[in-house]
C-alpha cells in the first residue's frame, strides 16, 4: 500500500499534467504566481535543449525566468516532476500522420517521429521512461499513433506492440546518433581515425580477423566514420516493416 506522501505526490503531478482538463483542487493561500506553469516548462525545455539535462535544476530554471529558486516550487515540486511535464509537452509537437498514406508509410512515420523527437531533444534519453506518468500530450500522441494503424484489424495488444517495437527501435538508433553527434563536436571522425587507425592496424592482424577486416574496410570507406546511424535506421526500419506487415495485413 502506497504511503500518504507517495499518493500526495501523484495527485500533485497528475494535477499539473492535466491542469487544463481537471480543475485545480482547492487549497490554502500561497504566494502569487507571476508566470505560468507552461512558461516554466518551456524554459526548462529550452535550457535542456541548449545545455543538456544535467544542467536542468529548479535553481537554473528559476534563473532563466528571473525568479528566486524557492518561488519555483510554487509551480513544480521537483526536477523529477518537471521532467515529466517537459516530456509531455514535447510529445504534443508531433504532426498528425496523414490517414491517406499507405499503411507502410504510416507505420514508418511513427518510428521517424519518435527518432526526430529524440534528435531534437536528446535530453529525453536521460529521462527514465518506465512509469513516466501519462499526461495529455503523450496520450494525444498515442491516440494519433493508434489512429494511424487502427485499420490493420488486429487486436489491441498487437496494436500496442507494433507501436512499442517501432518506437523502441527508433530510440535505440537515436541514442547512437546522439552519441555520434556529441563526439564529433569534440573531434571529427577523420581526426579520430588519424590517431587510432595506424595504431589499430599495427595491433590487429587481418589474417586473424579475415571477415571483420574485409567488411570493415568496405564500410569504413563508405561511412568515413565508425558507423552510419542514419543509414542503419533506414535499413533497419525497412526490415522491421517487412517483418511486421505480413502478419498485420494478412487475411
What would you call each of these model-derived segments?
Residues 1-34, 209-220:
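N-terminal intrinsically disordered/low-complexity leader segments
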Residues 43-51, 89, 93, 99, ...:
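Solvent-exposed, amphipathic alpha-helical segments
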Residues 39, 43, 47-81, 85:
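Helix-turn-helix
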Residues 41, 104, 230-241:
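Short, amphipathic alpha-helical "lid/cap" segments that border enzyme active or binding sites
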Amino acid at each position: 500500500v502506497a504511503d500518504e506522501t507517495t499518493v500526495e505526490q501523484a495527485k500533485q503531478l497528475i494535477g499539473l499534467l492535466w491542469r487544463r482538463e481537471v480543475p485545480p483542487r482547492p487549497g490554502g493561500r500561497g504566494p502569487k504566481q507571476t508566470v505560468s506553469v507552461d512558461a516554466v516548462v518551456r524554459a526548462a525545455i529550452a535550457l535542456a535543449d541548449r545545455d543538456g539535462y544535467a544542467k536542468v535544476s529548479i535553481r537554473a530554471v528559476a534563473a532563466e525566468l528571473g525568479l528566486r529558486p524557492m518561488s519555483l516550487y510554487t509551480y513544480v515540486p521537483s526536477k523529477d516532476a518537471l521532467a515529466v511535464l517537459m516530456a509531455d509537452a514535447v510529445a504534443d509537437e508531433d504532426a498528425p500522420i496523414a490517414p491517406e498514406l499507405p499503411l507502410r508509410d504510416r507505420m514508418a512515420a511513427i518510428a521517424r517521429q519518435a527518432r526526430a523527437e529524440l534528435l531534437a531533444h536528446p535530453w529525453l534519453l536521460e529521462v527514465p521512461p518506465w512509469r513516466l506518468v501519462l499526461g495529455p500530450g503523450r496520450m494525444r500522441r498515442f491516440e494519433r499513433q493508434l489512429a494511424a494503424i487502427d485499420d490493420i484489424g488486429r487486436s489491441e495488444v498487437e496494436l500496442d506492440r507494433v507501436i512499442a517495437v517501432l518506437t523502441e527501435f527508433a530510440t535505440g538508433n537515436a541514442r547512437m546518433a546522439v552519441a555520434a553527434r556529441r563526439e564529433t563536436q569534440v573531434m571529427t571522425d577523420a581526426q579520430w581515425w588519424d590517431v587510432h587507425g595506424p595504431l589499430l592496424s599495427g595491433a590487429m592482424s587481418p589474417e586473424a580477423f579475415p571477415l571483420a577486416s574485409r567488411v570493415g574496410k568496405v564500410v569504413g570507406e563508405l561511412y568515413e566514420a565508425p558507423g552510419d546511424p542514419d543509414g542503419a535506421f533506414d535499413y533497419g526500419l525497412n526490415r522491421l516493416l517487412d517483418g511486421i506487415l505480413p502478419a498485420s495485413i494478412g487475411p
